Amino acid sequence: MDNRISAFFASVKGKTVAFCGIGGSNLPLIRMFADKGAIVTARDRRSAEALGETAVLLSNLGVKLVLGDAYLSDLTEDIIFRTPGMKYGLPELTAARAHGAVVTSEMEVFFDLCPCKIYAVTGSDGKTTTTSIIAELLRAAGKTVHLGGNIGHPLLPDIETIAPDDVAVVELSSFQLISMRKSPDVAVVTNLSPNHLDVHGSMEEYIDAKKNILAHQGAFSRTVLNADNAITRGFADSVRGERMFFSRLEPCAYGVFLRTDGWIVHAPSGTEILRAEEIKIPGLHNIENYLAAIAAVWGTVSPEIIRSVARTFGGVPHRAELVRVLDGVSYYNDSIGTSPTRTIRGTLSLYPEKIILIAGGYDKKIPFNPLGPAVVEHVKLLILMGATAPKIEAAVKAAAGYRDGNPAILHAASMEEAVSLAHQHAQTGDVVSLSPACASFDLYPNFEARGNHFKQLVQALS
């Protein structure tokens, strides 16, 4: 085992450690620190009754529970782990830092201790798919891959089993990046557009958080940037190591791009890697995801392996996922559509005919005006639900091409009603897609729960 890892766990023995939030991802961490001799407190807004067996399990581990609305009061522990979605600048955390506490996160500690090469992906859209493609490419090349961050499972509990020749592939959100003080060996930024402004407060803070992925890189690091996105292209001057671009729209002098004849090409070598039509998962956005992933692994994974993976990898659940075909109607789950740009670049770019779209959800305080014209062009029936329904309707009706009834707009009070309305109005040959253009937090704990509920309802149709 790496000496840094041994020294770290020796240092936490007897220390008081708090975990703020008892989600499924924190449970292995809590168990690990308790086993290493830390004095652990688990804090959560939920009651013991709501936590159920989890509360019993933690108590049996000797973990102190602080529950209820005041779960962040009296934060006096030596080390405090915040969950990725918890605001870094919360007054309670700021006060704890002022009193000498170390406020950190699972990913921060993992980056400090990880003995192997780290690939990390961030961006507004395409993070999970790009991260998954990188992991698939490296596995196919014979690497032992540890997948984590916002995808997979917590990696810190595995730290003692990770070998120097392994690779870690992680997806990082702006919430995770905002406080990180170490950068990956290979950093990928897929794109940037307004998102999470309910948490960050301004687009500038959101951009700065994302840019932190490359802030601490060295001369032998690699950064992969989207040349087609003005914001990510603007990161170029901050790159300290190797800089690679990817582009779907124009050639790159150094990077990976889609040539006008349909070939994905590496520059400056001119290597023809594969044709875009060979990629199994559909959509222009997935071509971009492959461009980014190929740039990340170039020099480690051969073109032959890249082609093999592209032809066989079926993608990630909740991303334009075909649920079933019923009476000639195709139902797709694109619950990952958590922002207008995701829905525009995903669902609204995939189908040749106008579709039935279920949209709406939690309000992240981001503008919907770009969504309006895309809905008018690609949607024949728009079914709206959730807190953002009025804003989306207003954006659609304000679009230049909108005419009354084109698209038709209906409102639903629940997912059950939305699916029922779609089923009632769909005809043979239609596509029905859930792609909300919003987060799920007003009705569901996460986009996976929302997508799974949609799939259950669609499977129950007859």
Where are the regions a protein language model picked out?
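Short internal beta-strands
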Residues: 39-46, 223-227, 356-359, 378-387
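Nucleotide phosphate-binding/pyrophosphate-handling subdomain across enzymes
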Residues: 4-16, 26-36, 144, 276-380
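Phosphate-binding loop of NTP-binding sites
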Residues: 72-77, 84-227, 231-240, 257, ...
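N-terminal leader/targeting and accessory segments in enzymes
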Residues: 1-105, 109, 394
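Residue-level signal for inorganic ion chemistry
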Residues: 33, 80, 121, 150, ...
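Beta-strand->loop->alpha-helix junctions that form or flank phosphate-binding loops
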Residues: 41-45, 66-69, 104-108, 240-259, ...
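Short beta-strand "acidic-cap" motif of Rossmann-like dinucleotide-binding folds
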Residues: 39-44, 147, 169, 245, ...
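C-terminal helical cap/extension that packs against the catalytic core
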Residues: 55-56, 371-429
